[in-house]
Amino acid sequence: MKNLEPWEAVIGLETHVQLNTKSKIFTAASTAFGDEPNTHIDPVVCGLPGTLPVLNKTVLEYAVKTSLALNLNVAEHCKFDRKQYFYPDLPKNYQISQFDEPLAENGWLEVEIAEKDKETYLKKIGIERLHMEEDAGKLVHIGSDRLAGSKYSLVDYNRAGIALVEIVSKPDIRTGREASEYASEIRRTVRYLGVSDGNMQEGSLRCDVNISVRRGPNAPFGTKVEIKNMNSFSAIQKACEYEIERQIDVYENGGEIYQETRLWDEAKQLTKSMRLKEGSSDYRYFPDPDLGPIEISKEQKDQWLDELPELPSKKRQKYVKELGLSPYDSRVISDEVFMANFFEETVANGADPKLASNWITSDIVGYLKSNKQSFAELKLSPINLAEMINMISKKVISGKIAKEILPELIQDNISPQKVVEEKGLAMISDSASISPIIEELIIEYPKEVKSFKDGKTKLLGFFVGQLMKKTKGKADPKLANKLISEKLNS
């Protein structure tokens, strides 16, 4: 991205997180994903006359826990409001949300920003509020990916009424990278809490970006534009970077920025105008008369606070300070809760932390990616990985042999000790066994021996390689190197 000086971007994110409750926010209808359209609806979802909503207690618990994890102040009482608008995805013609009395306000999230060729830094991003609301249905446009150009549209109400929390950041973000990392940290947090799977592909986590530019940090805010339709963290970063440059170009050419909603076009890598932005007054909010106010006691908040797990930011600090991992490795390990738990259990079973980190982030992650599996699907137990790492440390097997048996351990979760014994893969680590093989090599390669003695000392690697071939990788490489060097120099 080009140098923006003297311009500065001002960015805020509205993040919608679907909560993974089994039933919807105000009804017992299922929240299962991927089923036939309009199979998870009922009279409450459809807004039929005489139906009354009832708040799902688990939704409140998950929303409060998310608020506490994001350092928000949870209100002692809050209420639901009706947000009025007419659109086919809302069968009631209003959405139940929270307006002037949200569940929680004034929090923050510390984000680690790592940019290429730049020093990693921490950024504390303020969070304005978190509120609960119901999701809308989904329109499917036939013949186009959007309403314009489609032959006709169909609506699926399976998603309507699913519980959401909307997390609104303060305008503290200044770059596309910061926006992307902030959204990533939100996803890590809700996954660690177990309140959402955070899958952007399934719509479980959706981000809208509000962005403007101004001439320097002390200038007044410019006109903000909302960007939608970003289904990955890289798309968030690219959309922000494109929009920043677009707005600067408009201003520098004497143009005007309009308050509007724009869509990110992934194929063309640009934002396109969708509609002029509505203000909050257009929605005619008023308190929902069918839902009473919510009161949350201090005792209940304290209980939910005690139930919070260790969050990714704390794990990163612990891995660096207590276990000696690099900041990069600590980020990779803590990125996914299943990986972090697996790593910690491996270390608890006696494995060296750095070795455990290396095996997990390179070999195991590589295997899972090539087999299109997630870490949650890993069959290998931490006990067996720790056993394999300790066998390498104790020179029972070589690293080469460990790499060869790892796929079998992952597939069947069997003891590495058992595999090594059954296949005779134990490391040859005594001079008495290696020395006769070296004598064979001296006889087989007289020209190479002469060349070594004439000064071509790099041939030492050749002899070590031949010895490893003869022992099928089972010889101790350090011992082999030492014994061959002694023989050739004698």
UniProtKB/Swiss-Prot annotation:
GO terms for molecular function: asparaginyl-tRNA synthase (glutamine-hydrolyzing) activity; ATP binding; glutaminyl-tRNA synthase (glutamine-hydrolyzing) activity. PROSITE patterns: GATB. Keywords: ATP-binding, Ligase, Nucleotide-binding, Protein biosynthesis. Signal peptide: none annotated. GO terms for biological process: glutaminyl-tRNAGln biosynthesis via transamidation; translation. InterPro entries: Asn/Gln-tRNA_amidoTrfase_suB/E, Asn/Gln-tRNA_Trfase_suB/E_cat, Asn/Gln_amidotransferase, Asn/Gln_tRNA_amidoTrase-B-like, GatB, GatB_C_1, GatB_Yqey_C_2, Gln-tRNA_amidoTrfase_suB_CS. The keyword Nucleotide-binding applies. It comes from the Bacteria. It catalyses: L-glutamyl-tRNA(Gln) + L-glutamine + ATP + H2O = L-glutaminyl-tRNA(Gln) + L-glutamate + ADP + phosphate + H(+); L-aspartyl-tRNA(Asn) + L-glutamine + ATP + H2O = L-asparaginyl-tRNA(Asn) + L-glutamate + ADP + phosphate + 2 H(+). Its EC number is 6.3.5.-. Belongs to the GatB/GatE family. GatB subfamily. Heterotrimer of A, B and C subunits. Allows the formation of correctly charged Asn-tRNA(Asn) or Gln-tRNA(Gln) through the transamidation of misacylated Asp-tRNA(Asn) or Glu-tRNA(Gln) in organisms which lack either or both of asparaginyl-tRNA or glutaminyl-tRNA synthetases. The reaction takes place in the presence of glutamine and ATP through an activated phospho-Asp-tRNA(Asn) or phospho-Glu-tRNA(Gln). This is Aspartyl/glutamyl-tRNA(Asn/Gln) amidotransferase subunit B. It comes from Prochlorococcus marinus subsp. pastoris (strain CCMP1986 / NIES-2087 / MED4). The gene is gatB.
